[in-house]
């Protein structure tokens, strides 16, 4: 085989592989509809459920209600809004800036590691 053949075919193969893997990753992460996540949630540190904050995720303004002052002790300011992401959800300040991103663990649980190492858990209220 000619070396020119390899020089031409390798870049094409790399582009195809990168495109395929990127497309499959994009298909595996679905952006949830905000209505799927709206409702009552509890925010707490792992192992400290008695110190939990009750939050209400709404699809209309005000987007986030409940005990936002309680949540501020971990977020350093009260959250005012939220939005879904393909791999979780984000809590935002009143300007729409992201305060924290919580990773989706399952349909009822989202988690984030705080700078001090504590695990912050957002869990859906059981009806």
Swiss-Prot record:
Annotated Gene Ontology cellular components are:
periplasmic space
Keyword annotations for this protein? Disulfide bond, Metalloenzyme inhibitor, Metalloprotease inhibitor, Periplasm, Protease inhibitor, Signal
| Protein location | Periplasm
List the InterPro entries hit by this protein, alphabetically. Inh (IPR022815), Inh/Omp19 (IPR021140), Protease_inh_b-brl_dom (IPR016085)
Regions crossing the membrane: none
User: What start and end residues bound the annotated signal peptide?
Assistant: 1-26
Q: Name one GO molecular function term.
A: metalloendopeptidase inhibitor activity
**Pfam families documented for this protein:** Inh
Main localization of the protein described in the UniProt heading: periplasm
> Where are the disulfide bridges?
53-70
UniProt record similarity statement: Belongs to the protease inhibitor I38 family.
Function field: Inhibitor of the alkaline protease.
| The protein, known as | Alkaline proteinase inhibitor
Q: Which organism is it from?
A: Pseudomonas syringae pv. tomato (strain ATCC BAA-871 / DC3000)
